[in-house]
Amino acid sequence: MGARGALLLALLLARAGLRKPESQEAAPLSGPCGRRVITSRIVGGEDAELGRWPWQGSLRLWDSHVCGVSLLSHRWALTAAHCFETYSDLSDPSGWMVQFGQLTSMPSFWSLQAYYTRYFVSNIYLSPRYLGNSPYDIALVKLSAPVTYTKHIQPICLQASTFEFENRTDCWVTGWGYIKEDEALPSPHTLQEVQVAIINNSMCNHLFLKYSFRKDIFGDMVCAGNAQGGKDACFGDSGGPLACNKNGLWYQIGVVSWGVGCGRPNRPGVYTNISHHFEWIQKLMAQSGMSQPDPSWPLLFFPLLWALPLLGPV
């Protein structure tokens, strides 16, 4: 082929290589997370402060609040699978968006700040094991553009095991849902926060075997609340985070999934246990962010084939 031919071939092959992955997706779940600026009504809860839960978002359909959501990275957020169960065509996510960095679930139509922190959803992924009932109630949403981090918008941490959080009494759940079973969150629809205790699954199963309503607590669930009731997630909080602090960083250990009423005694809220889905989350985020072959690379070889006969030895 000669030196000129070899040089041309090398240039074409270099151009035909794999495209670089998007920088925000190259290392999922590995960047800084779980930090917040503010350190200081879900049922029995109180108004939150802006920046206290910077990973909290509002999953919206045609700009109406549907569920809570938590930010994991620049392009990924976590919610509950049942938030989408009445919407059959998830291959078309048009109309779905996520709002971050706002205390209210109903920001003003004229708010530029809300407009610039609203991100359309490009893909929706339900757990492949979700069958429309309680177990495996978890979903990932991929955003169409990278989220800009600010002091009011930050990702939360995840980890493969949540065993160390069992029996903690100082975890928190946040959301814009009902403040009582029969009372919606009033205007100005401010994000609510409430402190809850983690209840081990053996005790939780025992509680749900009592009385007339029986419900099984599966291995991928975690319960939180208190024996007296009054502190719980409620309708509209679904998909939001159950978070605990560890060494100054916040970790999401659960996703709001279901409950019997809201804040009833001996009826804790039930959450999807993140640790049972950590590998699925990690793999999906990594696979979706992998390099893809440039679809134009085969076309680059046609000029090469045409030029080779013309390239003699130097």
From Swiss-Prot:
Let me know which tissues express this protein, per UniProt.
Answer: Expressed predominantly in premeiotic testicular germ cells, mostly late pachytene and diplotene spermatocytes.
Q: Does the keyword Glycoprotein apply?
A: yes
State the annotated membrane topology for this chain.
Lipid-anchor; GPI-anchor
Q: Where can this protein be found?
A: Cell membrane
Q: Where is the lipid attached (GPI-anchor amidated serine)?
A: 288
Q: What is its main location?
A: membrane
Q: Which GO terms describe its biological process?
A: proteolysis; spermatogenesis
EC no.?
A: 3.4.21.-
Which residues are reported to be glycosylated? 167, 200, 273
Concerning SUPFAM superfamilies, the annotation shows:
Trypsin-like serine proteases
Q: Which PROSITE patterns does this chain map to?
A: TRYPSIN_DOM, TRYPSIN_HIS, TRYPSIN_SER
Cellular component, GO, one term: side of membrane
Positions annotated as pro-peptide in this chain are 20-41, 289-314
- The entry's active site is 82, 137, 238
Family the UniProt entry places it in = Belongs to the peptidase S1 family.
Which named protein is this? Testisin
Taxonomic source organism? Homo sapiens
Q: Which gene encodes it?
A: PRSS21
